[in-house]
A protein has these predicted regions:
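N-terminal amphipathic/hydrophobic targeting modules at extreme N-termini
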Residues: 2-3, 7-9, 13-15, 40
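Short hydrophobic alpha-helical segments enriched in small aliphatic residues
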Residues: 21-24, 31, 42
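Polybasic, lysine-rich low-complexity intrinsically disordered segments
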Residues: 34-35
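Interdomain/boundary linker segments immediately adjacent to catalytic/signaling cores
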Residues: 40-126
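Active-site metal-binding core of divalent-cation-utilizing nuclease and nuclease-like domains
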Residues: 87-91, 104-146, 159-166, 173
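Active-site-adjacent loop/helix micro-motif of nuclease/hydrolase catalytic cores
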Residues: 152-167, 190-193
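Domain-level recognition of nuclease-like catalytic cores that cleave nucleotide substrates
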Residues: 186-222
Length: 222
């Protein structure tokens, strides 16, 4: 049986479900068979949406180029762990998601943040000062120096606090970084975070108003 909070949440999110629910309620007691049909239809749509939300979704930019090899490996790592991190049944913190993904990412050559201790933080240089000393650096969740690839894993703050924009800006400033992966939840509270982030980057590339240094951006919805 579907949890009650999922039913309420998806009825609020989906116009189709709201329509079905209103039709079912408006029929009243005089036609229980039709009322039951409408609610069964609504619940089946809830089930379909929930199953889709449990899948890994991804979108690669620019859309006129195929996904690069490193991105393809990153996708496989996320796919192999989706049963433990999908945001519908496992609404866990981003650090916990990263911990689950760490073995797979490390096996593919990434250095992954383990904790907030200085020795465990992954820093990527931005500016160099006197005698070549790093003057400014940004932290990343994972970094592959040879592939020039940065990964940022977000949870609830991805869209709510525009954390994905901060990730994008910092990746553009980092030295020796050509590729960025931003992983966000498919669903957070009543927000389709992955869809909203995709819409932003669709607009960014379609408008062609901002020229950035990244060769590829991979968006992941988990």
């Amino acid at each position: 049986m579907l949890p009650a909070h999922f039913c309420r949440q998806f009825l609020e999110l989906s116009p189709i479900l709201r329509y079905n629910a209103s039709c079912g309620l408006s029929l009243g007691r005089h036609n229980r068979r039709k009322k039951l049909f409408f609610w069964c239809n609504a619940l089946s749509q809830i089930y379909i949406i929930m199953e889709l939300m449990k899948m890994l979704n991804w979108l690669y930019f620019p859309k006129n180029q195929p996904c690069d090899d490193t991105s393809a490996r990153v996708i496989k790592v996320f796919e192999s762990m989706i049963g433990q991190i999908d945001s519908v049944t496992h609404p866990i913190a981003s650090n916990d998601v990263l911990a689950i993904l760490r073995p797979g990412l490390e096996s593919n050559g990434f250095r992954v943040e383990k904790s907030k201790r200085a020795e465990d933080i992954v820093s990527v240089p931005v500016l160099f000062g006197l005698n070549g000393k790093v003057e400014k650096a940004f932290e990343a969740d994972a970094y592959h120096a040879a592939a020039k690839y940065v990964i940022e894993v977000e949870a609830g703050r991805a869209v709510l606090n525009y954390q994905f924009l901060k990730d994008f800006f910092e990746a553009c400033m980092m030295q020796n970084v050509d590729y960025l992966c931003i992983a966000v939840r498919n669903l957070y509270q009543q927000s389709h975070d992955f869809q909203r982030v995709c819409t932003f980057f669709e607009s960014l590339y379609a408008s062609n108003r901002i020229i950035h240094p990244l060769k590829g951006i991979l968006l992941l919805g988990y």
